[in-house]
Amino acid sequence: MMSTKIDGKQIAAEIKTNLAERVNKLKAQGIQPGLGTLLVGEDPGSMKYVAGKHADCQEVGITSVKKELPADASFDDIAAAVRELNEDPACTGFIVQLPLPKGINENAIIDMIDPAKDADGMHPYNLGELVLHVRGDISTPLPCTPRGVLELLDAYDIDLNGKEVCVLGRGITIGRTIGLMLTRNAVNATVTLCHTGTRDVADHMRRADVIVAAMGSAGFVTPDKIKDGAVLVDVGVSRVYDEEAGRYRIKGDVDKACYDKASAYTPNPGGVGPMTRAMLLANVVEMAERHA
């Protein structure tokens, strides 16, 4: 079977080109979009991720608004930084980089974000809007990774109407939220959400036209668990030690041996990741356009 590699890097680049044009139009109206980030501590992964977001901003003409706090910052320190970003007119939307240091109530911090400035689309108000709006357009920010997955499939003309979609993992960042987006009238998929309590996960996977793997279990999706012609979307991230190279590598949930059996697949890395970052920028630009 001829399998299609779904190139997230290429589609994300096309989206960023479009966003840059829209940013220029906003600037012509005297509006300068700005993305804020709040980073607490010096976790290497978080620092790299935040730096990548600001590099993306520079590409499309979005201003960067950076706030950094030490690892021993108190809850009150972090809450004060969130309030400052809420009130900063240069910041159209912002994210609080997770995870926060141990002992900090992350949900309480996220609750403090102004929903209209929630660039990640993960504030309870915005998630509630997603639950309520089964029909019609949604004018609130959408979660970046699920939105990126749907944009990617749409770019490759993969129609999900009536399709069986098996989602592996029930995390709020992707598993639970993508189920809400997939079952909206505009998409119209039938979703099975599998998790650690699901019996016979492989049986659900073999029935699926599309599998969205977001477990963080390296190589969990193997050829014997999928049907011929399935579409595979790999969102999982695991650090696996490579004995030959003598270092850790990032591996996805989908075993590469599945690619030949699939009709289409997202590589990992290079599939969903670039789209998540592009959707963060899209949320910020759309926030600015709503106020134009």
Curated annotation (Swiss-Prot):
Q: Catalyzes what?
A: (6R)-5,10-methylene-5,6,7,8-tetrahydrofolate + NADP(+) = (6R)-5,10-methenyltetrahydrofolate + NADPH; (6R)-5,10-methenyltetrahydrofolate + H2O = (6R)-10-formyltetrahydrofolate + H(+)
Q: In which pathway does it act?
A: One-carbon metabolism; tetrahydrofolate interconversion
Q: Which InterPro entries match?
A: Aminoacid_DH-like_N_sf (IPR046346), NAD(P)-bd_dom_sf (IPR036291), THF_DH/CycHdrlase (IPR000672), THF_DH/CycHdrlase_cat_dom (IPR020630), THF_DH/CycHdrlase_NAD-bd_dom (IPR020631)
List the Gene Ontology MF annotations in alphabetical order. methenyltetrahydrofolate cyclohydrolase activity; methylenetetrahydrofolate dehydrogenase (NADP+) activity
Gene Ontology BP annotations? L-histidine biosynthetic process; methionine biosynthetic process; purine nucleotide biosynthetic process; tetrahydrofolate interconversion
What does the entry list under GO cellular component?
A: cytosol
Task: Tell me which domain of life the UniProt entry assigns to the organism this sequence originates from.
Answer: Bacteria
User: Which Gene3D superfamilies does its entry note?
Assistant: Leucine Dehydrogenase, chain A, domain 1, NAD(P)-binding Rossmann-like Domain
Write the Enzyme Commission number(s) for this entry: 1.5.1.5, 3.5.4.9
Q: Where does NADP(+) bind?
A: 169-171, 196, 237
Q: Which UniProt keywords apply?
A: Amino-acid biosynthesis, Histidine biosynthesis, Hydrolase, Methionine biosynthesis, Multifunctional enzyme, NADP, One-carbon metabolism, Oxidoreductase, Purine biosynthesis
Any idea what job this protein has? Answer: Catalyzes the oxidation of 5,10-methylenetetrahydrofolate to 5,10-methenyltetrahydrofolate and then the hydrolysis of 5,10-methenyltetrahydrofolate to 10-formyltetrahydrofolate.
Q: Which family does it belong to?
A: Belongs to the tetrahydrofolate dehydrogenase/cyclohydrolase family.
Q: How does it assemble?
A: Homodimer.
Q: Which NCBIfam families match?
A: PRK14193.1
Extract the HAMAP family matched here: THF_DHG_CYH (MF_01576)
Q: Could you identify this protein by its name? A: Bifunctional protein FolD
Task: Give the organism the record lists.
Answer: Bifidobacterium longum (strain NCC 2705)
Its gene is folD
